[in-house]
Amino acid sequence: MKNKLITFKNNNFTALVIYLENINFKYFKKFLLKKIQKSPIFFKNIPIALNIEKLAFNFNWINLKKFFFSIGLFLIGIFGCKKESVKLDILKSGLPILFKKKKTLLNFNKKKNFFNKNSNKNHYSSLFIKNQKSYLVNELIRSGQRIYAPNTDLIITNNVSPGAELIADGNIHIYGNMKGRALAGAHGDETRKIFCTKLSAELISIAGEYCTVDQIPIKFLENSVEISLVNKKIFIKYNH
């Protein structure tokens, strides 16, 4: 019996979706570059899709593709296009047309449990949380998972595996072993903090300023700490 070396299967992946409305290409470039400058780590290696359902301007799709490539972003495709002529222009540029499915949207209902206990632990996924005072996650955060809490605090009451990523515009609280990456103040708020009961993080960041595991003083590793930003530098102290 021959082994199957290549298998084709359907699968779903999540990505950061940018919604374009009444905006021209020049302004879009300026806006996106400003966002990246504020939160460079957040945008690093993240797949991006564009929703042009309400786009009033006609873009030069070849130039758009070149722009994304020049700044190191991964544009995986475009969806929401209604005009066949525009679809054809997009395809000619080498960009794929994506088709949206309800279960692949990034806006999850907060009453539903995003984490499936029976899911494959190697499944790569992202969770984008609607605005609320704070967001609580009790499940283990597995490698490859990314959780983003816009305009709020993120609270984790379990362990965070290596390769997992926590992002919040507010503070981040981790009541478990933190082995992944934590990025607080993602939109530039320098007053935000990271609280961790057991620090073993690959990377910690506040308002774009970051510190890797190699830069974290050994005395703070495996300890309960409070992380803040002082004079644009990461400051760590024991949290007793």
Curated annotation (Swiss-Prot):
Pfam family, one: MinC_C
Keyword annotations of the record: Cell cycle, Cell division, Septation
UniProt xrefs under InterPro entries: CAP/MinC_C, MinC, MinC_C_sf, MinC_N, Septum_form_inhib_MinC_C
Paired cysteines (S-S): none
Claim: DNA damage is one of the keywords in the record: no
Keyword Cell cycle recorded: yes
GO biological process: cell morphogenesis; division septum assembly; regulation of cell division; regulation of cell septum assembly
PANTHER family assigned to the protein according to its UniProt record, in alphabetical order: SEPTUM SITE-DETERMINING PROTEIN MINC
Family to which the UniProt record says this protein belongs: Belongs to the MinC family.
Cited function: Cell division inhibitor that blocks the formation of polar Z ring septums. Rapidly oscillates between the poles of the cell to destabilize FtsZ filaments that have formed before they mature into polar Z rings. Prevents FtsZ polymerization.
Subunit-structure text: Interacts with MinD and FtsZ.
Entry protein name: Probable septum site-determining protein MinC
Classification lineage: Bacteria, Pseudomonadati, Pseudomonadota, Gammaproteobacteria, Enterobacterales
Underlying gene: minC
